[in-house]
Amino acid sequence: MRAFYHHTQTGAALRWGLILPAIGLFAVGFAARRAVPFVPLAALLAATGWAFSSLTVEVTQTRLIWFFGPGLWRKSIEREAIMGVTPVRNPLWYGWGIHLTPRGWLYNVGGLDAVELALNNGRTLRIGSDETAALARALM
């Protein structure tokens, strides 16, 4: 189904915050000539940085779809399950990534802005975006 809203937000701080330490671990491992303990951790950090390098949000006629990075992990909900849409600003301590907050699940790669969705099952979730007004309009 064709999306009438599609936006990808790049999470530069999150990406580089994981990839730069990975490069450092590779360098330390090879300089110490003991790469074995460093390489797996460096590879894990680099893979995590790649997997969470961006957040893509799509709104189709019937669904809201979002995924991180290349789309290895996807989430979606029916639009009819969304009872309310509110642009919000997250506190700094909510952070980035995928995690449970006092306001429900948060999916975010950067910045503090998000759209809070009130669902018909009584739960809420927040999807981070640097285009909160456009995303909120697409969902209304």
Where are each of the predicted segments found?
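N-terminal membrane-targeting/pre-transmembrane regions
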Residues: M1-A32, L106-L112, L119, T124, ...
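Contiguous hydrophobic segments
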Residues: T8, A12-W16, E58, R63, ...
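Short, small/hydrophobic-residue-rich motifs at membrane-helix boundaries and re-entrant hairpins
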Residues: L14-I23, L41-L44, T48-A51
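Structural signature of transmembrane alpha-helix termini at the membrane-water interface
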Residues: A27-R34, G49-S53
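Short, aromatic-rich membrane-interface segments at the entry and exit
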Residues: R33-L41
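Conserved beta-hairpin
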Residues: A42-G84
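Non-transmembrane, membrane-adjacent beta-strand/coil modules in membrane-associated proteins
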Residues: W66-E131
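Short, well-ordered, aromatic-rich surface patches in folded extracellular/luminal domains
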Residues: L139
